């Protein structure tokens, strides 16, 4: 059966409206899910371990005697790594090493160090940078097991110097994924609990008798997990609420069309709501890509998902030139942006909004997903306009440092008291003035 992908032309009269329709996505809020999550959070907050145990045994069809029994010892993670097929173990270890190396360099460059300076009067100003004490990592379980996500979330936290990393992963029917457990070991995870869903998010946010409360929760999950993360935000930090995966390919027509087709598939196979778009000034090349899609789709194990994604939210867009493609790309602000062209850096300089930019025809998005090194946790749904990939900077917090000298107390006090009186806050003004007087008396003495 032929696949029907939307085809647009930027020169068309209604192009702007057509593109908006392609991009339109609003996460549906299921009232039943919201009510269930609210109840689970409240229950875990009130009953702690007992509630977590009840929900875990019910939803994952287990018969655990306690939450403590759901914690995996480090020896089990070590056994999972040892038991991997050698080639797969080597790939996982290589990916972990590359992700760690990238984030160690990122730590050096991203302002992760405290700093201060001294003014002429002896006043010291600066900033103290501190890693978070404890971070929670949510990992989907069952069939949707992604060891790469474990590495991408755990390694930057460990590189940042987070004191403790606590991972939760559901194990429906007791099924454990050795790749996920091995990735937890390589990523430096300290504790692993086999719990999931909203109850796991609640346990991490509020703490229970067994599960320690964390300062921030990271990691993907289903609609229940996303709702729970939204609700606990403020009690703890969260990484983001990610939407469906996205890829935007800018191509000048010089890349093998089958490569481009497979790159579009690489996001479409995630789920039916994923979005894959091609922008290209060469109409004949677009037709070749369309033909390659039709030829390659039947070879894909997840062809039904890919078809639904491409037909529902995909597009092949003819643009006037590559400069226009860059302008459109900035408006879309995609999660993944491939610039598959002879001169990728020329066009890359024009890109301002994208979660990750893949330069050159040999740079497939899938390499970034697994092993290039940069983080694959990226902003979606146009949030790349104001958000960044997950990184070591997400696991630091900053405190301002102020140490005022006696002379500085006089200089700053005059400014502060004047402004405080202007705002009608007399105690603020007096607090500054007392120190002005005290500093003056000390200098006289």
Swiss-Prot record:
Q: Biological process (GO) annotations?
A: L-histidine biosynthetic process
For this protein, the record's HAMAP family field holds: HisD (MF_01024)
For this protein, the Enzyme Commission number is: 1.1.1.23
* Pfam families membership: Histidinol_dh
Has keyword Cell cycle?
no
| GO terms assigned for molecular function | histidinol dehydrogenase activity; NAD binding; zinc ion binding
Q: Where is the active site?
A: 335 (proton acceptor), 336 (proton acceptor)
Q: What class of enzyme is it?
A: oxidoreductase
Gene assigned in the entry? hisD
Identification of the protein by name: Histidinol dehydrogenase
Which cofactor(s) are needed, names only? Zn(2+)
Organism annotation: Burkholderia mallei (strain ATCC 23344)
What family is this? Belongs to the histidinol dehydrogenase family.
Q: In which pathway does it act?
A: Amino-acid biosynthesis; L-histidine biosynthesis; L-histidine from 5-phospho-alpha-D-ribose 1-diphosphate: step 9/9
Catalytic reaction list: L-histidinol + 2 NAD(+) + H2O = L-histidine + 2 NADH + 3 H(+)
Key words of the record: Amino-acid biosynthesis, Histidine biosynthesis, Metal-binding, NAD, Oxidoreductase, Zinc
Gene Ontology CC terms: cytosol
What is the UniProt remark on how the cofactor binds and its stoichiometry? Binds 1 zinc ion per subunit.
- Where is Zn(2+) bound in this sequence? 267, 270, 369, 428
InterPro entries linked: Ald_DH/histidinol_DH, Histidinol_DH_CS, Histidinol_DH_monofunct, Hstdl_DH
Q: What does this protein do?
A: Catalyzes the sequential NAD-dependent oxidations of L-histidinol to L-histidinaldehyde and then to L-histidine.
Amino acids binding substrate: 245, 267, 270, 336, 369, 423, 428
Q: Where does NAD(+) bind?
A: 138, 199, 222
